[in-house]
């Protein structure tokens, strides 16, 4: 069997794709795999805030086009980058077991958020991270930085004014850089991005043979948790590049979901948690996500998001 896999060009994307390749070769030793590196619009717009150009699909549209045109058979994405709206003729046939979905602080002198000096400057281009950091400590100053993991880590040495940067822990794990972590940031401080920490394997809808083979990489618990998070995000009409966070986990067959919407300055924060018992009903995660989103909408979430768009 021959398989052409499409991925972004970044080192993290390649690390993630190589992990998928290793898993597939474990299950199918005779498989022949070719990796095709594809540059996306999001990779090109390094000097622009993604929230300003419309965050949805910026890191996968070109890869999806290659899939639709038959240039590749499988696309490997970070789940957090995949829009909640489905693309016709394509489907996410597997969601891999989630690596730690939380965010992490990398700081000078290896100190925590609480230990940072007054008016400390933290590097992140994420409105979600920045707004929640401001809500937690309103003296903190958010400095926009873009680029891959190494680029953003290097900013800490290159920019003397920076005291810390915030990155997804999963990326640090996959890149073998966990020694740099100063603090694993609790969802009490920053609720992570929906889907963060897992990979989504996307194929053409009619490729039944490949769908069957990729089923071995699908993790049911991750699919349920992320299903709830993405339903929450979808109801709010957001993407990974708006100040919306969602974090779900399964504890003793109970699905727990926390959702947050925050204004950019951190002054207005709406955050709630819900839980439900899991059964064989596949609609439970999406129902939970929708219900939580409706609760936040009643509390004013749409007003916060519309003001952000207008601004």
UniProtKB/Swiss-Prot annotation:
<comment type="subunit">
    <text>Monomer.</text>
</comment>
<feature type="modified residue" description="S-(dipyrrolylmethanemethyl)cysteine">
    <location>
        <position position="240"/>
    </location>
</feature>
<dbReference type="InterPro" id="IPR036803">
    <property type="entry name" value="Porphobilinogen_deaminase_C_sf"/>
</dbReference>
<keyword id="KW-0627">Porphyrin biosynthesis</keyword>
<comment type="function">
    <text>Tetrapolymerization of the monopyrrole PBG into the hydroxymethylbilane pre-uroporphyrinogen in several discrete steps.</text>
</comment>
<dbReference type="GO" id="GO:0006782">
    <property type="term" value="P:protoporphyrinogen IX biosynthetic process"/>
</dbReference>
<keyword id="KW-0808">Transferase</keyword>
<protein>
    <recommendedName>
        <fullName>Porphobilinogen deaminase</fullName>
        <ecNumber>2.5.1.61</ecNumber>
    </recommendedName>
</protein>
<dbReference type="GO" id="GO:0005737">
    <property type="term" value="C:cytoplasm"/>
</dbReference>
<dbReference type="InterPro" id="IPR022419">
    <property type="entry name" value="Porphobilin_deaminase_cofac_BS"/>
</dbReference>
<dbReference type="InterPro" id="IPR022418">
    <property type="entry name" value="Porphobilinogen_deaminase_C"/>
</dbReference>
<dbReference type="InterPro" id="IPR000860">
    <property type="entry name" value="HemC"/>
</dbReference>
<dbReference type="GO" id="GO:0004418">
    <property type="term" value="F:hydroxymethylbilane synthase activity"/>
</dbReference>
<comment type="pathway">
    <text>Porphyrin-containing compound metabolism; protoporphyrin-IX biosynthesis; coproporphyrinogen-III from 5-aminolevulinate: step 2/4.</text>
</comment>
<dbReference type="Pfam" id="PF03900">
    <property type="entry name" value="Porphobil_deamC"/>
</dbReference>
<dbReference type="InterPro" id="IPR022417">
    <property type="entry name" value="Porphobilin_deaminase_N"/>
</dbReference>
<dbReference type="Pfam" id="PF01379">
    <property type="entry name" value="Porphobil_deam"/>
</dbReference>
<comment type="similarity">
    <text>Belongs to the HMBS family.</text>
</comment>
């Amino acid at each position: 069997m021959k398989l052409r896999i499409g991925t972004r060009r970044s080192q993290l994307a390649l690390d993630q794709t190589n992990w998928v390749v290793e898993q597939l070769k474990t299950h199918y030793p005779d498989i022949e795999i070719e990796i095709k590196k594809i540059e996306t619009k999001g990779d090109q717009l390094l000097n622009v805030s993604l929230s300003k150009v419309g965050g949805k699909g910026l890191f996968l549209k070109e890869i999806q086009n290659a899939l639709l045109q038959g240039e590749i058979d499988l696309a490997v994405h970070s789940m957090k980058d995949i829009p909640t709206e489905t693309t016709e003729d394509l489907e996410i046939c597997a969601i891999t077991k989630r690596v730690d979905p939380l965010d992490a602080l990398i700081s000078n002198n290896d100190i925590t958020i609480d230990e940072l000096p007054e008016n400390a400057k933290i590097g992140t281009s994420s409105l979600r991270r920045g707004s929640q950091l401001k809500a937690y400590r309103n003296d903190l100053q958010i400095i926009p930085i873009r680029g891959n993991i190494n680029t953003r880590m290097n900013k800490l040495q290159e920019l003397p004014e920076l005291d810390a940067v915030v990155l997804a822990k999963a990326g640090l794990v996959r890149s073998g850089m966990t020694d740099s972590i100063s603090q694993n940031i609790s969802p009490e401080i920053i609720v992570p991005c929906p889907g963060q920490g897992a990979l989504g394997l996307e194929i053409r809808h009619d490729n039944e043979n490949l769908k069957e083979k990729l089923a071995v990489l699908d993790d049911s618990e991750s699919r349920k948790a992320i299903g709830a998070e993405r339903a929450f995000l979808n109801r709010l009409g957001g993407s990974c590049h708006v100040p919306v966070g969602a974090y779900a986990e399964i504890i003793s067959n109970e699905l727990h979901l926390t959702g947050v919407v925050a204004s950019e300055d951190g002054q207005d924060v709406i955050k709630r948690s819900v839980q439900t018992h899991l059964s064989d009903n596949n609609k439970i995660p999406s129902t939970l996500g929708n219900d939580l989103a409706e609760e936040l909408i009643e509390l004013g979430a749409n007003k916060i998001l519309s003001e952000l768009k207008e601004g």
